[in-house]
């Protein structure tokens, strides 16, 4: 096996970046306020990016910045300004899909590594070699590749070149995410970061000789969702993943909550480390990994293209809803004399049993004993989103612990 692969975790905001770092990421990928493909994510201002990169580097974690839109002419002057700013704050790499954007990055900040986004349709070793010859350090493989194809790519490219591969998260119905459904239905360009996810909508069928007659396609009483993929999950196949020559194991989810990011980062961190230490230990701990992964929001799971082309079992035809095991209550930002300061994310109440989720894998059940607002007034509950609260629990948490509540 090559060197220990990197665990690469998404972050939608500065607070989520800090959680990703603390809960086990080797590297974090983020988007700025321009040129990423997640316009609906909070994204990072330059100041947040600067702070996030400093925090990550203090903990020995790398930060990659996405600049992976498919650019139009109007984007190129702004790209030059953007890369000048990034040059000063020194991220560890830029993730790029567009050759025009790539050339600008290469000109302005050649000292920053350039990684080629999955949006560039990287499906063969010839493509990898092309980008290597252009100076790219790493290529993100298309989700449409099997493990066998990835191994073949590894055998044809330079030893120093890196392969990054998605191993967990949402799957796009379109080839390497290059979808036009959002453009067609809403005028919002998925390749400019504004996807409205029409693949998750409910559809009917029209027969061409009966225009205007919309016939529902039923899988159950709620209709059918013919483009709706299950989520990718390779937690049960780490032995195959770790022997395939992949250098970076990437988690999708740059619009996910801190709870989701913490759960997935912590679980894959332990699975990777256990598998490398002792495959038998990894197999023995499989029920714990599966339980933890299913504790955050997901859409049912598939192994995607890793073992061949997906069939109908990789789709969800009867609903577009997430499964949900826990509700996210907040992050512990400070603890003093047993009282923790949090920013509330969902309602909780006095006397309620909740869980403290810790980076080391432990989960502690605790009781909410007191809730005090910033004015020093006691509250019976915490109903207001993003309210700053001072909470006393039956056991004191630690900084960066996450509070959550198990759902039935």
Language model segments and positions:
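Glycine-rich, positively charged N-terminal anion/phosphate-binding segment
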Residues: 38-55
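Alpha-helix capping/helix-boundary segments
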Residues: 100-101
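Short beta-strand elements of ligand-binding domains
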Residues: 65-66, 96, 116-118
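Surface-exposed amphipathic alpha-helical tracts and adjacent flexible/coil segments at the periphery
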Residues: 1-11, 16-22, 27-34, 52-53, ...
């Amino acid at each position: 096996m090559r060197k220990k692969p990197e665990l690469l975790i998404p972050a939608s905001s500065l607070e989520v970046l800090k959680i990703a770092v603390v809960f086990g990421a080797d590297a974090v990928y983020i988007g700025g306020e321009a040129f990423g493909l997640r316009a609906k994510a909070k994204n990072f201002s330059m100041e947040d990016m600067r702070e996030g990169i400093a925090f990550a580097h203090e903990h020995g974690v790398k930060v990659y910045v996405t600049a992976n839109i498919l650019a139009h002419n109007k984007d190129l002057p702004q790209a030059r300004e953007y890369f000048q700013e990034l040059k000063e704050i020194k991220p560890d790499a830029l993730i790029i899909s567009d050759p025009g954007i790539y050339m600008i990055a290469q000109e302005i900040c050649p000292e920053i590594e350039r990684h080629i986004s999955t949006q560039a349709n990287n499906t063969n070793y010839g493509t990898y070699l092309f980008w290597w010859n252009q100076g790219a350090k790493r290529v993100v493989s298309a989700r449409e590749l099997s493990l066998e194809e990835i191994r073949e790519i590894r055998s044809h490219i330079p030893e120093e070149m890196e392969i990054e591969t998605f191993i967990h998260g949402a799957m796009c119905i379109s080839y390497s995410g290059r979808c036009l459904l959002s453009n067609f239905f809403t005028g919002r360009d998925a390749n400019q970061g504004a996807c409205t996810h029409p693949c998750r909508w409910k559809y009917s069928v029209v027969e061409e000789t009966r225009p205007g007659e919309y016939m529902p396609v039923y899988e159950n009483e709620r209709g059918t969702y013919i483009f709706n993929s299950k989520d990718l999950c390779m937690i049960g196949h780490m032995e195959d993943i770790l022997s395939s020559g992949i250098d970076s194991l990437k988690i999708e989810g740059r619009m996910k909550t801190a709870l989701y990011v913490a759960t997935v980062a912590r679980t894959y961190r332990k699975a990777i480390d256990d598998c490398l230490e002792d495959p038998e230990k990894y197999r023995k701990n499989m029920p714990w990994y599966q339980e933890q992964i299913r504790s955050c929001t997901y859409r049912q799971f598939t192994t995607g293209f890793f073992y061949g082309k997906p069939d109908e079992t990789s789709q969800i035809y009867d609903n577009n809803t997430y499964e949900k095991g826990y509700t996210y209550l907040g992050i512990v930002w400070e603890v003093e004399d047993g009282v923790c300061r949090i920013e509330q994310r969902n309602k909780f109440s006095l006397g309620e049993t909740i869980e403290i989720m810790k980076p080391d894998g432990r989960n502690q059940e605790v009781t909410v004993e007191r809730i005090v607002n910033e004015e020093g007034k006691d509250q019976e509950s915490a109903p207001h989103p993003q309210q700053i609260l001072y909470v006393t629990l039956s056991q004191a948490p630690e900084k960066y612990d996450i509070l959550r509540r198990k759902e039935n």
